[in-house]
Every structure is written in structure tokens, then in C-alpha cells.
Swiss-Prot record:
Family classification: Belongs to the PsaA/PsaB family.
Enzyme's top EC category: oxidoreductase
Gene this protein is translated from: psaB
Cofactor note: P700 is a chlorophyll a/chlorophyll a' dimer, A0 is one or more chlorophyll a, A1 is one or both phylloquinones and FX is a shared 4Fe-4S iron-sulfur center.
Lipid bilayer topology: Multi-pass membrane protein
InterPro entries: PSI_PsaA/B (IPR001280), PSI_PsaA/B_CS (IPR020586), PSI_PsaA/B_sf (IPR036408), PSI_PsaB (IPR006244)
E.C. number(s) listed in UniProt: 1.97.1.12
Biological function: PsaA and PsaB bind P700, the primary electron donor of photosystem I (PSI), as well as the electron acceptors A0, A1 and FX. PSI is a plastocyanin-ferredoxin oxidoreductase, converting photonic excitation into a charge separation, which transfers an electron from the donor P700 chlorophyll pair to the spectroscopically characterized acceptors A0, A1, FX, FA and FB in turn. Oxidized P700 is reduced on the lumenal side of the thylakoid membrane by plastocyanin.
GO CC terms in record: chloroplast thylakoid membrane; photosystem I
Protein name per UniProt: Photosystem I P700 chlorophyll a apoprotein A2
Membrane-traversing stretches: 46-69, 135-158, 175-199, 273-291, 330-353, 369-395, 417-439, 517-535, 575-596, 643-665, 707-727
Annotated signal peptide: none
HAMAP family (UniProt xref): PSI_PsaB (MF_00482)
Example GO BP: photosynthesis
């Protein structure tokens, strides 16, 4: 009996029903709730699992390199990045039959293959990889790192190598190590790689281990560094006629501030990127020497926080007590980490298309669309997770005595004001935006499009103008041709920036109008409503007017009966669950907007977006319906084309999504009856009755059914849109 799953909870292991399996899976990673867990074991388990995570990441990236080297066409793609389609890997069994084999044999391959829309080809090319041998070498190196990570994870679980709790709670040492050791040193190393390998590679010089020490990255070597003439490293940059990967039009500069894009590759100048990483390295190496460790110099985090008491008493005792609260709560730390990572991931989405760093990626439209959408969805999930762990912190780790009258306690004290203001903002945005859209819909329906309410986003246009966009005619700051900032920009800093901003072939500062104004506010509605649900869930996690003793019920309790006036949708878990729907909804609007605006930009018919995006029917008809037609014809009675796999995924995504509602809109008594009936029939059917359950089948709990429903809803939603996005973009632009 002792070996039954889950081993970490004897109580669950002895449960006679199928709850055992469900609750076992649900609490497998909740180390805090496991039998005989101690604080020390908790920290050690998490630390060891980080190495496991790293091992998986290294193995996965190694697999990407290996499969492209084995089954891809990297070497022929390098010869002509704009016209050869990059191959991700072979397809063993294309569906269905000979027409499918022919449809998927492309990119110069001998058999059926998948096209890569991840941007790895452009990335590897930009950083100096050129041959399949390079890819195999990289794959082997990452495989080696993966093995090292696994060994490190195992090692840190052995008695002799287990770190102590005091080691985990040494905030200053960890800060110094992460800032200097991880960010600083890795950025410096990356600058080194760019200067020694990638930039020579972009100029037609093949640098590898055999000639690495013979090739000078700059004609003057290290002399300018030691003599203080650093400006020499910026002189003679690549010319605007430079052909990437060749010496034609190449310069000798290694660290520049050109700004804008390389005319041929449409990506940022590699020498600008190297300069950026060097600056980041410098900042983080300095930052990583600021905190007090064994040497008695530098800042103490505790002293810093204790000293943060704003004058005038407006924030009470300021940051007093925060150090111990944060340092002793893993959930608080995880919440902060997830919030930061979520924002960073969304910024990656925004910057990968507006300031593309990889050669030729801007001309690979499907990849641009896929990467933007991918990073926005990931950001959404990570950000909602931040609030989930914030709520768990309030339930499990928050100590009111330790935080009396500090900023944290004051957040809880005036939560009603915070929640009601967020609620007001959401209602205002929702009703006004929908009102404008619906008004415009009605005007179109009655044949009077001139009666639409169209609002120019003048403030946003003014901000774009201030950064140098001249087409609006604002004549302000960088768009004012006779201003000092404009003239300085021509020579001193980023001379290519203003050209890039006003060039219409890239995605930097796209021209915006009434359609953008409306969808911007629709997205603002989604963001504010998601935030409202998440903030309310976290701030009410310990208790609310209706249920003041919520803390004693934990994070994910089900309804507490009708006694308090009904307590469904009131646990912190319920708030997270509802927020994820809003998050998906919001990211949907964000990606619809991005994709449609870019499709019309790439096709050269921006007026379609401008005219149709001001009313809902325009979005439904001219974006969704119009762009799904090719996809739905992936296979039809006449045969199969290369979009068939996406057509199938589109259908399958809808199926998974719809299945979610079976769990979301369900009455538990009915499910229990259904399960009992199925079990009864099973036990009385020949052959089927040879299989017996050890556990008595019972219906899912309310919380479980919501989780299963949410998982299906999310997966189906994302599968459906991914198929639509990739098929509609690749169908148009090859």
C-alpha cells in the first residue's frame, strides 16, 4: 500500500476513489504540502529542479540544431536566405497518400518536410554559423551542457552537497552572483562572440577555433582600448551597400551607434548590437558589486528597505519589514520573478518585429507573425501566474504583525479603493469602446459609412512625431527639421534612426488612425479587466466582506455552501481561473490587431485595415473570414495542398476548445450518475469486465472540472489561432 501514488501524501495514497490520481497530479509540485517536508528540503528540492529544467532546455535546443543539421537545408538557405524556404525537419508519414507527399516536398528537399517558422535559421546565420558541421558542433555542446545540468541537479541532492537554508536566504550574495556572474559575464561573453565571430562572419571572414587567435577583430587590435581612443572602434562602419556575409561594402568598425537597419538584411546593425551588449555587461558587472557580502562593504538589502520611509508619512512605515517578508516567502519571490519575466517576454514580442535583430527575419513574414504571437501568449500565462503566487503568498506566508503599516499592509487596507477604481476603468473602457464599434457597425449596415464616429489618435501620433516620424506634420522635437535634437541626430548619435522611422517598409512606428484608436482601447479594456480580476483575487485572498475567514480555507477551495449567501467564484484560485479567460481574450485582440495590420502592410493594401477595422463586421468579415478561406481549403474533394496540416489543426483546435465547455458548464450530480452507469455497464460486459478499477470512479470536484475545462479551452484556443495565423500568412507570402 505504501507504494501507491502519490508517495508524497499518505492521506491521498489511501483514498479509495479516483480523487487519489487527480489530487496527486494537482499537488505533485506543491512541495510545501507534502508529508514530512522541512524548510530545508523544500529549498533543496526547488534548487535541484532548476537544474532539471536547464537540462530540458539544453536538450530541446540541442534537438533543434541536430534536426536542422540532419534533415534541414541550412547550407543552401545561407546561399539565398530570401528565396529558399528553411526546413525544420522531415515528415515521416504525411497525411494522406501521394498528393500529401508531393505537397510537403519543398524547400529543395528530397521528401516531405516541415518549414521552419521559428526564426532559428536567421538567428544562427546572424551569429556566424554557416555549415551543417557548425550546427552539429552546437548540438553536441548543448547535449554536453544538458548532461552537466542533470549531474549538478543530482549532486545537490546528495547529503554532502546540499546547500543550507542560510545559503538560500543570503540575498546579497545571490544578487551579486546573478547580476555580475550571470547577466554581466554572459553579456560580456556574448559581446566577445559577436566581435570575434559574428561580425567577421557578416564580412565574409570565417572564424573558427583553428584561426580564432590569428584573426584580429579590428585592424588596430587592442591598442585603442589601452590608449583611451575608443572612438576608433566606431570608425569606418559597414556601408549602406554592404552585402551581408561578404566583404563587399564592409567596414572595420566593431562597436557603433549607427541606428536604424542594415539596408539589405532589414535588421539592426551587428556592430550596434555588440555595442549594446558591451554596455549592458558594464552596467551589470558594476551592479553586481554593489551589495554587502563577506567583505563588509556595499549595500545591505535590509538596511536599504528599512530606510525607505517616505517623508510626510503618506505611506506609513514605508518598506519596513519587507526584507524578511520577501526573503522568507518563496511565493513572493516567485511572484516578483514571474511579473518581471512576463513583462520582458511581452517586450521581446514587441521588439522582435519593430527592431529585428536577425538578418533577413523581417522579410520572413510568417516567422515574424509566429514569433510575435508566441511571445505574447507566453507573456500572458506568465503574468497571470505572478498574481496566482501573489495570492498564495497572502494566504500562506503573509504575517500582519511583521508588516504593520508598511506599504504592503496599506495595499490591503485600501484594497476597496484599488478594486473599485479598476472596476470603474474597465466599465468605462468596455462600454465606450463597444459603443463606438457598434455605432459604426449600424452606420455601415444602413449604408451611411460617412456617419461613423472616427477618432484620430492625436496624442499617440504626437508621441510618434516626437520620436522623428514626420508624416503627421506635427513638427515637434525629432520631427522638427530645424531643431537642435534633429541636427545632433544627423551626426552624433544614431544617424540611421530617423531614416528608419520614416521608411515605410519596416514595422517601426506604423502609421496609425481611427481603427488603431478603437482596437487600442479594446485591448486596454482587456488588460484592465484581467488585472482587475487578478488584483482582486490576490488582495481578497485572505478574506473579504462576504467571507472574512478565507485564509483558513486555503488557495483553491470549492463553494462553501449557501450559508454565506453562496461562495462560488470566491477563492483566490477562482479569480485566477476567470482571469485566464480574459487574458486569452485580450491576447486574441492583440494578435488579431498585429496580424491584420501587418498583412495589409506586407500586401501593400493598408487601406483595407484602415477602412474595415473601425467596425466589428469589418474584423469578422475582412480579417477572420477572408483569411481563413485558404486554410479551410487545405484539403477538399479535389485533393491536398501544403496547408492541409494547418486545416486539420484548425479543426482539431476547435474540437478541443469546444470540449472545454463540457467541463465548464456542468452539473456534478449528473456526472456522478453518468460515471456510475458507465462503471455498472462495464462490470457486466464480457471482456470489459476483466478490467477492474482499484479506485472507485467519482465525478470531478468543481475546482478540478474548472481546471480541465480551462486547459481544454486554452489549448484549443491557441491551436486554432496558431493554425489560422501560420496558414493565412504562409499561404499569401510563401
Amino acid at each position: 500500500m505504501a507504494l501507491r501514488f502519490p508517495r508524497f501524501s499518505q492521506g491521498l495514497a489511501q483514498d479509495p476513489t479516483t480523487r487519489r490520481i487527480w489530487f496527486g497530479i494537482a499537488t505533485a509540485h506543491d512541495f510545501e504540502s507534502h508529508d514530512d517536508i522541512t524548510e530545508e528540503r523544500l529549498y533543496q528540492n526547488i534548487f535541484a529542479s532548476h537544474f532539471g529544467q536547464l537540462a530540458i532546455i539544453f536538450l530541446w535546443t540541442s534537438g533543434n540544431l541536430f534536426h536542422v543539421a540532419w534533415q534541414g537545408n541550412f547550407e543552401s538557405w545561407v546561399q539565398d536566405p530570401l528565396h529558399v524556404r528553411p526546413i525544420a525537419h522531415a515528415i515521416w508519414d504525411p497525411h494522406f497518400g501521394q498528393p500529401a507527399v508531393e505537397a510537403f516536398t519543398r524547400g529543395g528537399a528530397l521528401g516531405p518536410v516541415n518549414i521552419a517558422y521559428s526564426g532559428v535559421y536567421q538567428w544562427w546565420y546572424t551569429i556566424g554559423l554557416r555549415t551543417n558541421e557548425d550546427l552539429y558542433t552546437g548540438a553536441l555542446f548543448l547535449l554536453f551542457l544538458s548532461a552537466i545540468s542533470l549531474i549538478a541537479g543530482w549532486l545537490h541532492l546528495q547529503p554532502k552537497w546540499k546547500p543550507s537554508v542560510s545559503w538560500f536566504k543570503n540575498a546579497e550574495s545571490r544578487l551579486n552572483h546573478h547580476l555580475s556572474g550571470l547577466f554581466g559575464v554572459s553579456s560580456l561573453a556574448w559581446t566577445g562572440h559577436l566581435v570575434h565571430v559574428a561580425i567577421p562572419g557578416a564580412r565574409g571572414e570565417y572564424v573558427r577555433w583553428n584561426n580564432f587567435l590569428d584573426v584580429l577583430p579590428h585592424p588596430q587590435g587592442l591598442a585603442p582600448l589601452f590608449t583611451g581612443q575608443w572612438n576608433l572602434y566606431a570608425q569606418n562602419p559597414d556601408s549602406s551597400s554592404h552585402l551581408f556575409g561578404t566583404s563587399q561594402g564592409a567596414g572595420t568598425a566593431i562597436l557603433t551607434l549607427l541606428g536604424g537597419f542594415h539596408p539589405q538584411t532589414q535588421s539592426l546593425w551587428l556592430t550596434d548590437i555588440a555595442h549594446h551588449h558591451l554596455a549592458i555587461a558594464f552596467i551589470f558587472l558594476v551592479a553586481g558589486h554593489m551589495y554587502r557580502t563577506n567583505f563588509g562593504i556595499g549595500h545591505s538589502m535590509k538596511d536599504l528597505l528599512e530606510a525607505h520611509i517616505p517623508p510626510g508619512g503618506r505611506l506609513g512605515r514605508g518598506h519596513k519589514g519587507l526584507y524578511d517578508t520577501i526573503n522568507n516567502s518563496i511565493h513572493f519571490q516567485l511572484g516578483l520573478a514571474l511579473a518581471s519575466l512576463g513583462v520582458i517576454t511581452s517586450l521581446v514580442a514587441q521588439h522582435m518585429y519593430s527592431l529585428p535583430a536577425y538578418a533577413f527575419i523581417a522579410q520572413d513574414f510568417t516567422t515574424q507573425a509566429a514569433l510575435y504571437t508566441h511571445h505574447q501568449y507566453i507573456a500572458g500565462f506568465i503574468m497571470t501566474g505572478a498574481f496566482a503566487h501573489g495570492a498564495i503568498f497572502f494566504i500562506r506566508d503573509y504575517n500582519p504583525e511583521q508588516n504593520e503599516d508598511n506599504v504592503l499592509a496599506r495595499m490591503l487596507d485600501h484594497k476597496e479603493a484599488i478594486i473599485s477604481h479598476l472596476s470603474w476603468a474597465s466599465l468605462f473602457l468596455g462600454f465606450h469602446t463597444l459603443g463606438l464599434y457598434v455605432h459604426n457597425d449600424v452606420m455601415l449596415a444602413f449604408g451611411t459609412p460617412e456617419k461613423q464616429i472616427l477618432i484620430e489618435p492625436i496624442f499617440a501620433q504626437w508621441i510618434q512625431s516626437a520620436h522623428g516620424k514626420t508624416s503627421y506634420g506635427f513638427d515637434v522635437l525629432l520631427s522638427s527639421t530645424n531643431g537642435p535634437a534633429f541636427n545632433a541626430g544627423r551626426s552624433i548619435w544614431l544617424p540611421g534612426w530617423l531614416n528608419a522611422v520614416n521608411e515605410n517598409s519596416n514595422s517601426l512606428f506604423l502609421t496609425i488612425g481611427p481603427g488603431d484608436f478603437l482596437v487600442h482601447h479594446a485591448i486596454a479594456l482587456g488588460l484592465h479587466t484581467t488585472t482587475l480580476i487578478l488584483v482582486k483575487g490576490a488582495l481578497d485572498a485572505r478574506g473579504s466582506k462576504l467571507m472574512p475567514d478565507k485564509k483558513d480555507f486555503g488557495y483553491s477551495f470549492p463553494c462553501d455552501g449557501p450559508g454565506r449567501g453562496g461562495t462560488c467564484d470566491i477563492s483566490a484560485w477562482d479569480a485566477f481561473y476567470l482571469a485566464v479567460f480574459w487574458m486569452l481574450n485580450t491576447i486574441g485582440w492583440v494578435t488579431f490587431y498585429w496580424h491584420w495590420k501587418h498583412i495589409t502592410l506586407w500586401q501593400g493594401n493598408v487601406s483595407q485595415f484602415n477602412e474595415s477595422s473601425t467596425y466589428l463586421m469589418g474584423w469578422l468579415r475582412d480579417y477572420l473570414w477572408l483569411n481563413s478561406s485558404q486554410l479551410i481549403n487545405g484539403y477538399n474533394p479535389f485533393g491536398t495542398n501544403s496547408l492541409s496540416v494547418w486545416a486539420w489543426m484548425f479543426l482539431f483546435g476547435h474540437l478541443v476548445w469546444a470540449t472545454g465547455f463540457m467541463f465548464l458548464i456542468s452539473w456534478r450530480g449528473y456526472w456522478q450518475e453518468l460515471i456510475e452507469t458507465l462503471a455498472w455497464a462495464h462490470e457486466r460486459t464480457p471482456l470489459a469486465n476483466l478490467i477492474r478499477w482499484r479506485d472507485k470512479p467519482v465525478a470531478l470536484s468543481i475546482v478540478q472540472a474548472r481546471l480541465v475545462g480551462l486547459a481544454h479551452f486554452s489549448v484549443g484556443y491557441i491551436f486554432t489561432y496558431a493554425a489560422f495565423l501560420i496558414a493565412s500568412t504562409s499561404g499569401k507570402f510563401g
